[in-house]
Swiss-Prot record:
Site positions (Required for activity): S362
CDD domains the record matches: ATP-synt_F1_alpha_C, ATP-synt_F1_alpha_N, F1-ATPase_alpha_CD
Recorded GO MF terms: ADP binding; ATP binding; proton-transporting ATP synthase activity, rotational mechanism
Gene3D superfamilies according to UniProt: 2.40.30.20, ATP synthase alpha/beta chain, C-terminal domain (1.20.150.20), P-loop containing nucleotide triphosphate hydrolases (3.40.50.300)
Gene encoding the protein: atpA
Protein name: ATP synthase subunit alpha
């Protein structure tokens, strides 16, 4: 067989021309310190802030402190197998979590991994946990109501879609109950709900999940949980995971309600991380950027413009106070970021007034424009009337004689307090709220004994369901009150048939 030198040289040239180097250049470093969910590594010269890093044992971390000699890293997940001297690699990516429809009805951890024992979550969509909030021109003003089903909120401190409304109060004053009831009331409202449990007992989270399942609310809800037993980095990350999942739906033109229960525990976890990373402590040992921790989270809740789909994220962040002190550091930070707050009073709760909303300290800065016309008409002055009743009630403790006008205000105030009480997990449709508040503000309840108000309301709603469903339908469809004469006649008919005369 003859060897053709030209053919061989042509083949070699072709091979050289088509050669593509197939190798990866990965920047690696060495772990120099490990402990308490924190690692330090040397040798990662070009790492970016917030970049995902891969440890030798398969765990991941996030770069936080970029210093001249080493990098401070928070570890996402188990750090018991990581040792000093282990290799750590850059990934060139930032932290992302799975998002999409397949997460609905599931309970996941802050990394998007299922913890409910129902198998893998199949989705190929991911979103970064840290993302810029919509800009000024990408937003719309809040114009649609978000009905919580709670008379005290929908009448006194209404919430609109795209609003951030802080729920603040001491422990055991009913904050979580308000959130769960609001989620239950979103059934058939074309709303997706995300409940983020931060630093709670696992038994408590289990109870909330079972409540949602029992009332059929898990069909439109995602639960993100970072329990008290998990490392601080996961507690810090949980709210950002929740809002990343919410953004996926918002940019599809859908409406989302997200509950952060509660941000006080996230702030404590962030303080812990910052102190371990040797960042300079400030007031109450919190780092200087603790305001930015919450502002960049809550600014991602918005009602976006029609060009971006017209979707919304409504946020209900919680803050736990100590002895009702709403002037504390984290509390005032979040109050200044949000569009209003609902303050739950310890004294009111213990007096059996539930939900224990303090009308004087609670406000909604944008929700009023989202109220339906009917509710605006019946509840216009209710919050001020209730706050003035509380003041008058304090004066009556001195035992002075009262004139007829003051006595009438006190009588109306006592009945208002009773009407605004509501049992747990029984949200009320807005049309029923409007009818009972109309009866209250137009004096139909002034002669009803205070002790009978709860029974009066039950029979009142039963009567309207059976005898005058068209009135409820009118309010539901037109968002406005029917003719006053029609409503007055229906309420008078009920009073004539009942034993409350």
């Amino acid at each position: 067989m003859a060897i053709n030198a030209q053919e061989i040289s042509a083949l070699i040239k072709q091979q050289i021309e088509n050669f593509k180097p197939n190798f990866d250049v990965t920047e690696t470093g060495v772990v120099t310190y490990i402990g308490d969910g924190i690692a330090r590594a040397h040798g990662l010269e070009n790492v970016m802030s917030g970049e995902l890093l891969n440890f030798e044992n398969g765990s991941y971390g996030m770069a936080q402190n970029l210093e001249s000699t080493d990098v401070g890293i928070i570890i996402l997940g188990d750090f018991t197998d990581i040792r000093e001297g282990d290799t750590i690699r850059r990934t060139g990516k930032i932290m992302e979590v799975p998002v999409g429809e397949s997460l609905i009805g599931r309970v996941v951890d802050p990394l998007g991994r299922p913890v409910d024992g129902l198998g893998e979550i199949h989705t190929d969509k991911t979103r970064p946990v840290e993302a810029p909030a919509p800009g000024v021109m990408q937003r719309k003003s809040v114009s649609e109501p978000l009905q919580t089903g709670l008379k005290a909120i929908d009448a006194l401190v209404p919430i609109g879609r795209g609003q951030r409304e802080l729920i603040i109060g001491d422990r055991q004053t009913g904050k979580t109950t308000i959130a769960i009831d609001t989620i239950l009331n979103q059934k058939d409202q074309d709303m997706i709900c995300i409940y983020v449990a931060i630093g709670q007992k696992e038994s408590t989270v289990r109870t909330q999940v079972e409540t949602l399942r029992q009332y059929g609310a898990l069909d439109y809800t995602i639960v993100v949980t970072a329990s008290a037993s998990q490392p601080s980095p996961l507690l810090f990350l949980a709210p950002y995971t929740g809002v990343a999942m919410a953004e996926e739906f918002m940019y599809q033109g859908k409406h989302v309600l997200i509950v952060y229960d509660d941000l006080s525990k996230q702030a404590v976890a962030y303080r812990e991380l910052s102190l371990l990373l040797r960042r300079p402590p400030g007031r109450e040992a919190f780092p200087g950027d603790v305001f930015y921790l919450h502002s960049r989270l809550l600014e991602r809740s918005a009602k976006v413009s029609d060009e971006l789909g017209g979707g919304s994220i409504t946020a209900l962040p919680f803050i736990e106070t100590q002895a009702g002190d709403i002037s504390a550091y984290i509390a005032t930070n979040v109050i200044s970021i949000t569009d209003g707050q609902i303050f739950l009073g310890d004294g009111l709760f213990n007096a059996g007034i539930r939900p224990a909303i303090d009308a004087g300290s609670s406000v909604s800065r944008v929700g009023g424009s989202a109220q339906i016309k009917a509710m605006k008409k019946v509840a216009g002055t209710l919050r001020i009337d209730l706050a003035s009743y509380r003041e008058l009630e304090a004066f009556t403790k001195f035992g002075s004689d009262l004139d007829a006008a003051t006595q009438a205000k006190l009588n109306r105030g006592r009945r208002t307090v009773e009407v605004l009480k509501q049992p747990v997990h029984k949200p009320l449709p807005v049309e029923k709220q409007v009818t009972i508040l109309y009866a209250l503000t137009h004096g139909f309840l002034d002669t009803v004994p205070v002790d009978d108000i709860v029974r009066f309301e039950e029979e009142f709603h039963t009567f309207f369901d059976a005898q005058h469903p068209e009135i409820l339908e009118t309010i539901r469809d037109t968002k406005d009150l029917p003719e006053e004469a029609v409503l007055d006649a229906a309420i008078t008919e009920f009073l004539n048939q009942s034993s409350f005369q």
